[in-house]
């Protein structure tokens, strides 16, 4: 069993899993997290107010992180292929619902299903790839996570082109349909390597849940992982507002997050190379420090040149953090329930996705500006990095 497993790791099939992962993350991110590109067309087609449109995105995000994470936990009990196929069918169902519904409730249902299917796909991809690698694990994860950045870069122009010619339903039929077909195609290939690294059949039941809830280091790692994303969701919520407050023209500020995503594509590959050489936990922690420091600098940005420099640093931080967490937690807490473990961390991340924008808004209102909020959120990011680093320390070093 071990010889068979060793022969599969770092093999041609391993890299096929990576290639499909890049494609799936590109499409999933390009559908779910480019909402701002098509939100106006969606609102016009279904008569949604600004509040209702923002609620649609909130529901999608909640489903992506919470329902997708929980689906990942449950997926540890069954073979992966039907789970992946179910996610593909879910995306197809979401596209179908959007074609026929005319109500706000129908739109919420469609995007809730889309978020759940997309989140499930995400958890499967990032938990499966590390199981197929040994020597090149960091490089493989870095390449896989380029899909996220490529989706944010490549899909917006496609959305714009399609919306100008077909409207929201037609655009969703094309992009959503391509996403569904790609996930279904991956279902024919995706499986866990024979025997897993642990040689055990994954079991997620009451005992596993109890042991997980009583594992202080896992809980510290989950808390840290949630906090270390504080900077990212603060930027998602109000980067344009932060930059324009400092005097950056709005048209320039509107392109800022795309720059972060673009830089992160190269940084994801580079971080994998660094991880294979200096250590995966050290590389991720360095990315957290860079992101937190950049957040603290952001309130003092008053010109475009330093703005671009800080955006490059954010992209470097994102490129180090995003691809490396799953191999860290799988390696530390065991690959036998890899999908479930990653699902737990994904659910934890949802808390920050919701709370960081709210905390930023409340602190900004209380302080009258962005300086204090961003400094405090930078500290929270650093605290998350420390907790995650300590919580994922090898058992011998614990």
Please annotate each region the language model reported.
Residues 35-40, 215-269:
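Extracytoplasmic gate region of multi-pass secondary transporters
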Residues 144-192:
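Helix-loop-helix hairpin linking two adjacent transmembrane segments in secondary transporters
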Residues 42, 120-133, 320-333:
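Intracellular juxtamembrane helix-capping segments at the cytosolic ends
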Residues 260-264, 277-328:
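C-terminal transmembrane helical hairpin of 12-TM major facilitator-type secondary transporters
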Residues 67-79, 267-279:
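Helix-to-loop junctions at the C-terminal end of transmembrane segments
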Residues 111-146:
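Cytoplasmic helix-loop-helix junction between adjacent transmembrane helices
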Residues 42-43, 74-75, 154-166, 243-244, ...:
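Interfacial helix-cap and linker-helix signal at transmembrane-aqueous boundaries
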Residues 89-102, 290-302:
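C-terminal ends and interior cores of transmembrane alpha-helices
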């Amino acid at each position: 069993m071990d010889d068979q497993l060793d022969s599969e790791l770092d093999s041609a099939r391993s890299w096929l899993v990576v290639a499909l992962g890049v494609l799936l993350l590109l499409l999933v991110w390009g559908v779910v997290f480019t909402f701002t590109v098509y939100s106006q067309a969606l609102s016009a087609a279904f008569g949604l107010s600004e509040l209702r449109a923002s609620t649609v995105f909130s529901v999608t995000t909640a489903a992506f992180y919470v329902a997708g994470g929980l689906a990942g936990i449950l997926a540890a009990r069954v073979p992966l292929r039907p789970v992946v196929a179910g996610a593909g069918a879910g995306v197809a169902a979401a596209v179908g619902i959007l074609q026929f519904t005319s109500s706000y409730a129908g739109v919420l249902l469609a995007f809730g299903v889309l978020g759940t299917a997309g989140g499930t796909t995400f958890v499967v991809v990032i938990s499966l790839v590390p199981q197929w690698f040994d020597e090149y694990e960091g490089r493989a994860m870095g390449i896989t996570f380029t899909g996220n950045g490529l989706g944010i870069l490549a899909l917006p122009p496609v959305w714009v082109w399609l919306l100008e010619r077909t409207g929201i339903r037609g655009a969703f039929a094309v992009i959503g349909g391509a996403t569904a077909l790609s996930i279904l195609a991956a279902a024919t290939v995706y499986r866990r390597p024979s025997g897993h690294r642990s040689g055990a059949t994954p079991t997620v039941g009451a005992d596993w849940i109890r042991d997980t809830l009583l594992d202080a280091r896992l809980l510290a790692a989950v808390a840290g992982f949630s906090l270390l994303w504080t900077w990212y969701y603060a930027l998602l919520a109000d980067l344009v507002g932060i930059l324009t407050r400092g005097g950056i023209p709005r048209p320039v500020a509107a392109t800022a997050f795309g720059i972060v995503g673009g830089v992160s594509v190269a940084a994801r590959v580079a971080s994998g190379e660094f991880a294979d050489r200096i250590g995966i936990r050290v590389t991720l922690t360095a990315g957290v420090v860079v992101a937190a420091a950049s957040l603290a600098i952001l309130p003092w940005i008053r010109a475009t040149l330093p703005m671009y420099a800080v955006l490059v640093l954010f992209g470097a931080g994102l490129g180090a953090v995003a691809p490396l967490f799953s191999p860290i937690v799988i390696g530390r807490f065991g690959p036998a329930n890899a999908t479930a473990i990653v699902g737990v961390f994904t659910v934890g991340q949802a808390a920050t996705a919701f709370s960081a924008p709210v905390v930023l808004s409340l602190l900004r209102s209380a302080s009258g500006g962005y300086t204090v909020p961003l400094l405090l959120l930078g500290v929270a990011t650093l605290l998350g990095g420390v907790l995650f680093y300590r919580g994922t320390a090898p058992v011998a070093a614990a």
